[in-house]
Amino acid sequence: MDVTTSAWSETTRRISEPSTLQGTLGSLDKAEDHSSSIFSGFAALLAILLVVAVICVLWCCGKRKKRQVPYLRVTIMPLLTLPRPRQRAKNIYDLLPRRQEELGRHPSRSIRIVSTESLLSRNSDSPSSEHVPSRAGDALHMHRAHTHAMGYAVGIYDNAMRPQMCGNLAPSPHYVNVRASRGSPSTSSEDSRDYVNIPTAKEIAETLASASNPPRNLFILPGTKELAPSEEIDEGCGNASDCTSLGSPGTENSDPLSDGEGSSQTSNDYVNMAELDLGTPQGKQLQGMFQCRRDYENVPPGPSSNKQQEEEVTSSNTDHVEGRTDGPETHTPPAVQSGSFLALKDHVACQSSAHSETGPWEDAEETSSEDSHDYENVCAAEAGARG
């Protein structure tokens, strides 16, 4: 029994040994496969890391190259073809020949002397500010004298429109030429260097006396306002028997200093004239005589039909003007006639006649054509009061 048991065990052991060897070999193969797979994984990971590192290095190198200066530096090897810079002289006069000093001549300074003398002569010969107005005044005086020699009345006139009776432009013997003082520093018209024609008291009396009898050559220009006791006398043109000029105030205020624009004391172009006392009956007569409305323009001469219509209107208004100026106590409030004057653009002629109906109109037409050259000066007519 023992022999069979031992034999059985021996056979079993022999059978089991190859299986054990096979199992060992299989386990060894599996371990080798596992280790090889791990090694290959590590190798692949290392390769990826190396590739990433190389890419990063290349990117950094390219970025550094872009930051570098694009031009080449010449400091390393300078070019030999460049010319050397010339040495400039510190003083240009050192290079000039000194012939004048060798011959005993001194350098000329005539330019500096001439310039200094010119400056001194300008300062010494320049006129002071006080002499400049005197020269201008002398020139103006010569101009005024030449103008008076031509026979025209020259003066400074008020800017406001006023009724005027204009005839001959010859200067009146009764006018007094008043010239302001030259030394006054004021710039007003009272102290200016212009001549002002002021009518005397004798001429005013003749004007008031001749108001009842109208002169032979009378042409009335309209004014802007009625005559008031505070009115001023403006410059007349012509002789006292032929021409009379009466001024109306620019403003209603009688105080010359209160007016900012029309006052002659505050402006450089106007002159305060003597006041006309219209408290007398003769003054009131003039007040009614020269009351006109300002409907004045330069109207081109129309056809013959318009002239005939104007002559008819003038002849119809002549009786009113004569009736108003016959006696010194006659005072008829004038009124501006309308209706037929609309065709003439509200412009008609008002003129008193002492001889005939057509004669004065012809004289007035000649006077207006001489004054305006191309246009007829037509003023508003004065008609009697209507009931």
Curated annotation (Swiss-Prot):
InterPro entries: LAX (IPR031393). Keywords: Adaptive immunity, Cell membrane, Immunity, Membrane, Phosphoprotein, Signal-anchor, Transmembrane, Transmembrane helix. Phosphorylated on tyrosines upon TCR or BCR activation; which leads to the recruitment of GRB2, PIK3R1 and GRAP2. Residues 319-329 have a biased composition (Basic and acidic residues). Residues 360-369 have a biased composition (Acidic residues). Residues 118-129 have a biased composition (Low complexity). This is Lymphocyte transmembrane adapter 1. Negatively regulates TCR (T-cell antigen receptor)-mediated signaling in T-cells and BCR (B-cell antigen receptor)-mediated signaling in B-cells. One of its GO terms (biological process) is negative regulation of T cell activation. GO terms for molecular function: protein kinase binding; SH2 domain binding. Residues 1-37 are extracellular. It is a single-pass type III membrane protein. The modification Phosphotyrosine is found at Y195, Y270, Y296, Y375. Residues 59-387 are cytoplasmic. Residues 241-268 have a biased composition (Polar residues).
